[in-house]
Structures are given as C-alpha cells and as structure tokens.
Amino acid sequence: MERLFEHTLNTRPILENSLRFIRSDVPTQVSAAEKDRLAAHNITTIVDLRSAAECAKAPSPLMDDARFTYLCRPVTVGNAVPETADDVSRLYIAMVDGALRRTIDTIWNTKTNVLYFCSAGKDRTGVVSAILLHKSGMSLEYIVADYMKTASNLKAFLESYAREHPGIRLDVIMPHERYMEEFLAWLAAQKI
C-alpha cells in the first residue's frame, strides 16, 4: 500500500496485511487525496491521544471532515519526557490508567479501521500499539520489532529534537528494545 500521508514520519499499520490499526505521528497536513484514500480504505475512526493544549497548537485537519469519526482521547498520565532510561518503562506503565483502557476498548471494538496518533507517534502511540498487538495475540518479538521501527523512522527527528533541547537526553528518548520488553513483562500480568 502507498503511504497514507506525505508529511508524517511514523505512519504504518501494526498488523501485517491489515489496515485495522494504523499508528502515526500527528497528521497536521492532510491533502484532499489523502483524506479520500483514508475513506476509501475505511480508515474512518480517528483517535487523537494528544492533550487539549497539543491539539490546539497543532490541530489535525481530519477533525472537521464529516467522513471521519474524530475522537479526542488524551493520554495525560505519564505524559512527560523521561529523565533517565529507567523512567521510560515506568512512564509507559503509568499511562495505562482507566481512561487509556477505555480508549483501547473503543479502538478494539470499533467497526471501521482506526488511525490513532499522538505528537511523535512514539510513546503514547507505542503503548496503545503494544496493547493492541498483545490483545491480537502477537508475540513479544513482533511487538518489540514494531516498536523499534519507530527508532529508525524518527531517528533524524529525535536527534534534532535533542540538539534543540539540551536538557533532553537522546539515549533516553530514542526507543530501545528494553523499554518495550519491560512494559510487556508488566502487561502480561494485566487483564487488558
């Protein structure tokens, strides 16, 4: 399948040969042809995981198109830049509160294909993806491999971000297998 969006870095289906769940960074520039492509592939439920402030700063043009059901489901618990590598998996675990569980249920039970995203499509989107893949019965290796695609997709962006924000450590914000493996070890004991 062709790219869904020209101006995103991390848009992709999480299940092979299926458009059921599409993860992304925020699509802020969406052409009419891209909207038509989404609708043609029945990707009509849009779940925005960003905070109200993030949405106001960078609104998605999918919000105002009647062909799409646009759901604002902010993930705000654990929504901070981790200071150390040890904080990352704890941050991911903290995200899984009642609101996120309801969001997962919404995504899982909707009748259409779903596009979901946060700002960079890395942490909040990564946690949602991991849970959806876990519920789909995918292996730990598959889930970690999906998560690690984000490292290559966002490498240049994250390097630039770390240069522009000297207090942010690149080795912490860059996805590492360990972060997802620790989260998945916790997730295996949950009933989600």
Which sequence ranges carry the predicted segments?
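Ser/Thr-glycine-rich phosphate-binding loops at phosphate-binding pockets of nucleotides
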Residues: 120, 124-125
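Cys-dependent protein tyrosine phosphatase-like superfamily
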Residues: 1-115, 127-192
